[in-house]
Amino acid sequence: MAIIESNQLLTFKLGNETYGIQINKVREILTYPTVTPIPDASRWVKGVINLRGEVAPVIDLRVRFNINDDPIYTNRTIIIAVKTQDMRMIGLVVDEVSDMENVDLDRLYPAPDMGTSIAPEYLKGLFKKEEKMIVILDIDRILDKDEMQRLSRASEGATNVYSASA
């Protein structure tokens, strides 16, 4: 099985490091909208947003991966909306969107067991561009099944709130 299914990556910054996600997972890039908090959620779950009629949890990758424990949210904060393998929409808070990269499969490497600030189970692999390495995140593993189910149940309540206000 190939490390990635798409030969294009959307790259973004978390702290000083560059990361990538497969472009075929990306649905939209938006500035930080109104986020409805979810009670008792993990501290890296900022809440949920209404994204074109679909309620999506918002995950701050900076907090999730201990890159920034006290981030600031402004109207310039970026969310990348992505679809997971099971077709659920989630929003990922990042520091900045960088570029779209065409992946040369000869420069693609499996995820290392160490050497990155993010645990290897969240990685698809590495892509070497010139002299730097871009860490490719595995979107489908950022939330495990239990976390996704818990967020889905909590989001159902938010769906009712969004529906009532429409």
Positions of predicted regions on the chain:
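An acidic, low-aromatic, low-complexity terminal/linker signal
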Residues: 1-166
